[in-house]
């Protein structure tokens, strides 16, 4: 039996009262009662109206579990059906012992979907009872993917950015970008928010949505430098077709907090040279794979086990300190954690049960 710090797997798994399954002896030949799972579609999730605080709390719970050695993460895998489709699938897998759930998420990332009026990232999350392998839930994970990504960015800032940060520069207007800005602003109440993306119609629509929901003016910039230079917090969530050093290291002011997580690298190799602390969500995922904003830095040895300060879960769990002074210039690179998907999926299931939302489907 795998043993976790201070607990065994059986100790760690809470009783899953919400799983409506009835097991019988399959070898006896007696009829087996229906095995049910919960299905939450996008409309159900929208009706739940998860608050910013609920989203951040759910994701931080998974980070703390990770930092305490109570999780299992399998490195993500990719499927590229055809280069002509300009997209790929990511498959994320994990287990969160304190929640008693294992999960597998499949998310499609198709850059040209905007031409069809579709989101670029659409996902499904499957949750399972880790003791039996039985399915617990199937959830539309498009919201989960967007919101948990923003929560990771915000939690990274909570531990690694200056507390008096007042200017945010955000590159990119994809689905996750909205939640980056919204959840960061929920923690910092910025005086100035700047946004930029490649397509004018995209960045203008992004700014309009933020102004409506945050109730403050958003500055739309015409170029990367105007967005980034002098900002206290910089988030790079671009969608480049191939690596290109669009974000210049000289634009980053001392004491800033930088979050690069675009699929393709958009930063200079010298970016890591100015950093006090470099933190990732999961080193196992970051050190390999086809994609990632700091892939070239890993391959060049600029980001390694020796130069890495730690994983965000270690900081969230109190095992390592976060920012220690205003002079630090810190970086957080996240590839996306299956643990965050599972934790937010769990929070949605709990709230859906309280609100009477979702459908019970017969699995077997």
Language model feature labels by segment:
Residues 44-49, 269-364:
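Adenosine-phosphate binding glycine-rich loop
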């Amino acid at each position: 039996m795998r043993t976790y710090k201070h607990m065994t797997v059986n100790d760690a798994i809470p009783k899953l009262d919400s799983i409506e399954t009835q097991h019988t002896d399959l070898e006896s030949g007696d009829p087996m009662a229906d095995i049910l799972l919960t299905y939450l579609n996008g409309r159900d999730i929208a009706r739940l109206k998860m608050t910013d605080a609920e989203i951040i709390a759910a994701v931080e719970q998974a980070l703390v579990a990770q930092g305490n050695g109570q999780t299992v993460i399998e490195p993500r895998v990719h499927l590229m059906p055809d280069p002509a489709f300009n997209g790929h699938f990511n498959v994320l897998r994990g287990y969160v012992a304190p929640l008693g759930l294992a999960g597998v998420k499949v998310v499609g990332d198709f850059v040209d979907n905007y031409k069809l009026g579709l989101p670029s990232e659409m996902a499904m999350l499957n949750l399972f009872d880790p003791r039996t392998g039985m399915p617990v839930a199937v959830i539309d994970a498009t919201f989960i993917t967007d919101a948990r990504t923003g929560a990771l960015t915000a939690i990274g800032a909570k531990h690694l950015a200056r507390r008096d940060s007042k200017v945010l520069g955000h590159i990119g207007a994809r689905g996750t970008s909205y939640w980056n800005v919204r959840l960061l602003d929920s923690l910092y109440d910025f005086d100035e928010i700047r946004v930029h993306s490649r397509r004018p119609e995209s960045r203008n629509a992004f700014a309009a949505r933020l102004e409506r929901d945050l109730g403050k003016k958003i500055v739309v910039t015409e170029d990367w430098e105007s967005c980034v230079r002098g900002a206290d917090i910089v988030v790079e969530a671009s969608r480049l077709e191939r690596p290109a050093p669009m974000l210049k290291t000289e634009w980053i002011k001392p004491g800033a907090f930088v979050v690069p997580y675009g699929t393709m690298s958009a930063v200079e190799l010298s970016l890591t040279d100015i950093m006090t602390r470099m933190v990732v969500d999961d080193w196992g995922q970051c050190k390999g794979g086809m994609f990632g904003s700091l892939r070239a830095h890993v391959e060049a040895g600029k980001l390694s086990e020796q130069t890495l300060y730690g994983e965000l879960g270690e900081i969230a769990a109190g095992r390592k300190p976060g920012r220690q002074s205003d002079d630090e210039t810190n970086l957080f690179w996240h590839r996306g954690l299956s643990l965050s998907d599972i934790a937010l999926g769990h929070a949605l299931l709990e709230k859906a049960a309280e609100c009477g939302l979702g459908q019970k489907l017969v699995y077997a």
